[in-house]
Swiss-Prot record:
Reaction(s) catalysed (UniProt annotation): AMP + ATP = 2 ADP
Function as written in the Swiss-Prot or TrEMBL entry: Catalyzes the reversible transfer of the terminal phosphate group between ATP and AMP. Plays an important role in cellular energy homeostasis and in adenine nucleotide metabolism. Has a broad specificity for nucleoside triphosphates, being highly active with ATP or dATP as phosphate donors, and less active with GTP or UTP.
Domain statement: Consists of three domains, a large central CORE domain and two small peripheral domains, NMPbind and LID, which undergo movements during catalysis. The LID domain closes over the site of phosphoryl transfer upon ATP binding. Assembling and dissambling the active center during each catalytic cycle provides an effective means to prevent ATP hydrolysis. The LID domain is a solvent-exposed domain that is much shorter in Mycobacterium than in many other bacteria like E.coli.
Residues where ATP binds: 10-15, 127, 166
First-tier enzyme category under EC: transferase
EC number: 2.7.4.3
HAMAP family reported in the protein's UniProt record: Adenylate_kinase_Adk
Organism whose genome encodes this protein: Mycobacterium tuberculosis (strain ATCC 25618 / H37Rv)
Name of the featured protein: Adenylate kinase
Subcellular location: Cytoplasm
Protein family according to the UniProt entry: Belongs to the adenylate kinase family.
Pathway field: Purine metabolism; AMP biosynthesis via salvage pathway; AMP from ADP: step 1/1
UniProt keyword Transferase, yes or no: yes
InterPro entries given in the database record: Adenylat/UMP-CMP_kin, Adenylat_kinase_CS, P-loop_NTPase
Amino acid sequence: MRVLLLGPPGAGKGTQAVKLAEKLGIPQISTGELFRRNIEEGTKLGVEAKRYLDAGDLVPSDLTNELVDDRLNNPDAANGFILDGYPRSVEQAKALHEMLERRGTDIDAVLEFRVSEEVLLERLKGRGRADDTDDVILNRMKVYRDETAPLLEYYRDQLKTVDAVGTMDEVFARALRALGK
């Protein structure tokens, strides 16, 4: 099963990605983790990504796409994966579609974790991260709405909405139901 997780910062995608991957026996692929691992290993892509991250810039889509494409070549991803944090734009979604088409496959499901902005603010402020000020959080939500929300329209035929308010286990049960598991 090939599953994408979408939702604003603080919706619980990372937590649910780990649980879903474990339950379904497929890898969780997080672009943040891909960046970290490639940087640590000093790969060509990692060195290039580090230049952008060190400058405080977003890693360009073509480089992110290349990292994801490279990761999808690993044998553990042959039977499926949970993608967390990618794609972030329609441009990246189209690139992902091409990657999967070359492999003769496609996305099976797209889960959107939905949470009100009030709940997100509370969750993010509760994490205690230095950069989680109200202004920064509100800006991240705006960026999500502007950049990532168009993906909801792009994936409308595969999209399943998951109410992400509740305990970790309640949200996990809803996510499994949305996947028909």
